[in-house]
A protein has these predicted regions:
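A solvent-exposed, acidic/Ser-Thr-rich amphipathic alpha-helical stretch
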Residues: 26-76, 84, 88
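Exposed beta-sheet edge and beta->alpha loop/turn motif
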Residues: 84-112
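Residue-level preference for long, well-ordered alpha-helices that form the structural scaffold
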Residues: 2, 6, 46-47, 100
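Residue-level preference for beta-strand/loop junctions
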Residues: 5, 63, 77, 103-105
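Short, low-complexity N-terminal intrinsically disordered segments enriched in polar/charged residues
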Residues: 1-31
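Low-complexity, intrinsically disordered short segments enriched for Gly/Pro and polybasic residues
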Residues: 8, 14, 21-22, 44-45, ...
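Activation on folded, globular domain regions of eukaryotic proteins
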Residues: 11, 18, 68, 75, ...
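Short, structured motif recognition centered on aromatic/hydrophobic residues
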Residues: 10-11, 35, 58, 79, ...
């Protein structure tokens, strides 16, 4: 794979994630993936666990979730992206009652 292919793959993945379709993850993640999450999550092993433990609750809590990349850089073996997630906190998430307020979180992701 070349850098441009890898960069486009990640950009396409974020477009798919904005659909909030859990099955869209299947196109971009290996079934035996490991997601290294922040405190509160730790490491999640396996695509199905990732979808059920991370993305499904997130999509439910932030039904208008949207992710936008600001910068995507790539090489032949890696990709890194940074940008923002936005949404409205509409349901319980990580034992935090919904606030009805908009959120904006900066992210930085790295893939090998």
């Amino acid at each position: 794979m070349n850098a441009e292919y890898n960069k486009k793959l990640v950009e396409d993945m974020y477009v798919a994630l904005n659909t909030k379709d859990l099955d869209a993850h299947d196109l971009y993640w290996h079934k035996d993936m490991i997601w290294h999450g922040p405190p509160g999550f730790g490491n999640i092993h396996g695509l199905e666990n990732f979808k059920e433990q991370v993305m499904k609750p997130f999509y439910a809590a932030f039904p208008d979730y949207y992710v936008k990349n600001d910068i995507v850089v790539a090489d032949e073996k890696w990709v890194s992206a940074t940008g923002y997630l936005t949404g409205t906190h509409s349901a319980n998430y990580l034992d935090i009652e919904p606030t009805g307020k908009a959120i904006k979180m900066q992210f930085s992701d790295f893939w090998l």
